[in-house]
From Swiss-Prot:
It comes from Serratia proteamaculans (strain 568). Pfam families: NQRA_2nd, NQRA_N, NQRA_SLBB. InterPro entries: NqrA, NQRA_2nd, NqrA_C_domain, NQRA_N. The gene is nqrA. Belongs to the NqrA family. Its EC number is 7.2.1.1. This is Na(+)-translocating NADH-quinone reductase subunit A. The keyword Nucleotide-binding does not apply. NQR complex catalyzes the reduction of ubiquinone-1 to ubiquinol by two successive reactions, coupled with the transport of Na(+) ions from the cytoplasm to the periplasm. NqrA to NqrE are probably involved in the second step, the conversion of ubisemiquinone to ubiquinol. NCBIfam families: nqrA (TIGR01936), PRK05352.1-2 (NF003759). Composed of six subunits; NqrA, NqrB, NqrC, NqrD, NqrE and NqrF. PANTHER family: NA(+)-TRANSLOCATING NADH-QUINONE REDUCTASE SUBUNIT A (PTHR37839:SF1). It catalyses: a ubiquinone + n Na(+)(in) + NADH + H(+) = a ubiquinol + n Na(+)(out) + NAD(+). Transmembrane segments: none annotated.
Length: 449
């Protein structure tokens, strides 16, 4: 077991009950362009056209052969583009339950471990489940024909308010194990299943599949942490990773021939009336998913974690491709007179500047207030408290802000994704957002080497 000591479990109110309920009937689903780093779509459908679940909607121009498929059957309601015609979303109006679908090849469970790699890749590409895989470094969809040094399956989640993966995997353990057998065909290295200490996920007889326990505060459950300790990456060493619900979907596809776009998500946060786990579908409309479940007031709905999720609004108001959590916070519009000098028992701080810091068992109703604007980046040790990886966070963050890609690469930025720096943003006394500057530097490194 690997136990980390640095990090932070955010003491936020509104954690969900760990029991799955059926969610509302979803009438609209969407694929979001922002979920896929560096993707340039070549559209294969038009507005008004009817599609089946699993039918290709567009192909990536940069990596031909990578298709993005419909998560439900219905009619293409809108294809939304932003500035410079960047794809925002492809919205589908679900019809007849949304389950009219294309059929794919399926196999007996005993044959999965013997399938040729090319056959596995071909079916994943055709079904669209290839896009569930992401590379590290750069967090992009893998190129067809490439081979990773290892594959990581993230079967734990330490993000604030997250669902317990063990509850979800227990319902579909056979499909999960089948998915692991299929994933093992894509690499000559290990398939690392990373789970929380004490979790019972069964065991694969295949020696290629290894189970790794992690314990400690967030980010113990992030794939970046797992990769850092087990298979550190570089420009010459690439690994892939995938979420546990996508591993279940792959197992279902190869054993039944049907594309499984079901998704269990946690609807949680201080502004949710009854935080709960809901069974819904991939790309579900957030407005429909949260209808009648939020407290009164001006709320900010986030697809993903409060630390690293996406504010949903307009054409992007749909469940993110890689999210299994919808968080809701109150918009912080109120101004506080002399708030910096008040004892503040209802405010949390990682430093000893508020009374709330000393209330160890208290849960806080966080809002979107940042309690200040941008200022100088002051190195007072906050970043080191929440960064368990073997890097120098203050120096790295400084170089990211300066856009110094050479120094940032030497300090380990290739191991990171936006979510890995979310805690650094949260505890930053200068109120900087480190995720976008990390992405800018990673893009520069990828282009220039």
């Amino acid at each position: 077991m690997i136990k980390i000591r640095k990090g932070l479990d955010l003491p936020i109110a509104g954690a969900p009950a760990q029991a799955i309920q059926d969610g509302p009937i979803i009438q609209h689903v969407a694929l979001l362009g922002e979920d896929y780093v560096g993707m340039r779509p070549s559209m294969l459908v038009q507005e008004g056209e009817s599609v089946k679940k699993g039918q290709a909607l567009f192909e990536d121009k940069k990596t031909p052969g990578v298709f993005f498929t419909a998560p439900a059957s219905g009619r293409i309601l809108s294809i939304n583009r932003g500035e410079r015609r960047v794809l925002q979303s492809v919205v589908i109006a679900v019809e007849n339950g949304g389950d009219e679908q294309l059929e794919f090849a399926h196999y007996p469970v005993a044959e999965l471990a013997m399938l040729p790699r090319e056959q596995v890749e071909s079916e994943l590409l055709a079904s669209g489940l290839w896009t569930a895989l992401r590379t590290r470094p750069f967090s992009k969809t893998p190129a067809p024909g490439s081979t990773p040094r290892a594959i990581f399956v993230t079967a734990m989640d330490s993000q604030p308010l997250a669902a317990d993966p063990q509850v979800i995997i227990a319902e579909q353990l056979a499909a999960f194990n089948a998915g692991l057998a299929v994933l093992a065909r894509l690499t000559d290295g290990k398939v690392h299943v990373c789970h929380a200490a004490g979790a019972n996920l069964g065991k694969q007889p295949d020696a290629q599949v290894t189970y790794n326990e992690f314990a400690g505060p967030h980010p113990a459950g992030l794939v970046g942490t797992h990769i850092h300790f087990l298979e550190p990456v570089s420009l010459k060493k690439t690994v892939w990773h995938i979420g546990y619900q996508d591993a279940i979907a792959i197992g279902t596809l190869f054993t039944t021939g049907k594309l499984d776009t079901r998704r269990v998500v946690a609807l949680a946060g201080p502004q949710v009336e009854q935080p709960v786990l809901l069974r819904t579908r991939l790309g579900a409309s957030i407005d429909e998913l949260t209808a009648g479940r939020l407290k009164a007031g001006e709320n900010r709905v986030i697809s993903g974690s409060v630390l690293s999720g996406t504010h949903v609004a307009g054409p992007n108001a749909y469940l993110g491709r890689f999210h299994s959590l919808v968080s809701v916070l109150q918009e912080g519009r109120d101004k506080e007179l002399f708030g910096w000098i008040a004892p503040s028992p209802d405010k949390f701080s990682i430093t000893r500047t508020t009374l709330g810091h000393f209330l160890k068992n208290k849960l806080f109703a966080f809002s979107t207030t940042t309690h200040g604007g941008e200022r100088a980046m002051v190195p007072i040790g906050n970043y080191e408290r929440v960064m368990p990886l073997d890097i120098l966070p203050t120096l790295l963050l400084r170089d990211l802000l300066a856009g110094d890609s050479d120094s940032a690469q030497a300090l380990g930025c290739l191991e990171l994704d936006e979510e890995d720096l979310a805690l650094c943003t949260f505890v930053c006394p200068g109120k900087y957002e480190y995720a976008p500057v990390l992405r800018d530097v990673l893009t520069k490194i990828e282009q220039e080497g």
